[in-house]
């Protein structure tokens, strides 16, 4: 039986593939699909964020797509912000 962390990791992979597979390339999340993903999957996070700038910031190799490693950088940003918010009184 998978642990809670293993389930969470598997869920991250599934979310990434749900959106990257829209264009048929499970290794690349293109801009329109990235926008759809972040507005659907983390609407609170992107309320005050310029999604175009976020995409450019995450696209470290400048190939106009977000690979899984670049996606994880966003997950870390969201996770850190969410953790910080959870400690606000």
Swiss-Prot record:
Positions of Ca(2+) 2 binding: 59, 61, 63, 70
Bilayer topology: Peripheral membrane protein
Keyword Cell membrane tagged: yes
Binding site for Zn(2+): 17, 27, 83
Domain (EF-hand): residue spans on this chain: 13-48, 46-81
GO cellular component, one term: extracellular space
Protein name listed in UniProt: Protein S100-A8
Source organism: Mus musculus (Mouse)
Gene: S100a8
